[in-house]
Amino acid sequence: MIMWQSLILISSGAALGASLRWGMGLILNPLFAAFSFGTLIANYLGCFIIGLIMAMIWQHPQFSGEWRLFMITGFLGSLTTFSSFSAEVMENFIQQKWLIGLGIMSAHLFGCLIFTGIGVLITRWLN
């Protein structure tokens, strides 16, 4: 596949995923003012879809590379990065690599919280 074809597939999927996430936020976030319900549902949906795709790929290794670029890298990548994180952890758990899976979980959770905190602190410091 030519590079520009890959970029079109990824970009098309990303546009759809980002639009869905935005729409879910518009509709669901106002329902619970103190909680980003749209984001939570987007993460849950992305994890559910990547679980379906992972299982299909495991059962059918000939699964199209183009479809993976469109759905996983593009659509789910823009809908949520949590789905990729979830897939990596689950893949290790399924392979009974418990410590690696727990390590990935810890690194993502604590690392993201730390970097979010650093971003908040830097913004406060600059203002």
UniProtKB/Swiss-Prot annotation:
Q: Which UniProt keywords apply?
A: Cell inner membrane, Cell membrane, Ion channel, Ion transport, Membrane, Metal-binding, Sodium, Transmembrane, Transmembrane helix, Transport
Report the InterPro entries cross-referenced here: FluC
Q: Which reaction does it catalyse?
A: fluoride(in) = fluoride(out)
Superkingdom, natural source: Bacteria
Checking Pfam families in the record gives:
CRCB
Q: Name one GO molecular function term.
A: fluoride channel activity
Q: Which residues bind Na(+)?
A: G77, T80
Write down the NCBIfam families for this protein, in alphabetical order. PRK14196.1
**Role played:** Fluoride-specific ion channel. Important for reducing fluoride concentration in the cell, thus reducing its toxicity.
Annotated PANTHER family = FLUORIDE EXPORT PROTEIN 1-RELATED
What is the protein name given in its UniProt record?
Fluoride-specific ion channel FluC
Question: Which organism is this protein's natural source?
Answer: Mannheimia succiniciproducens (strain KCTC 0769BP / MBEL55E)
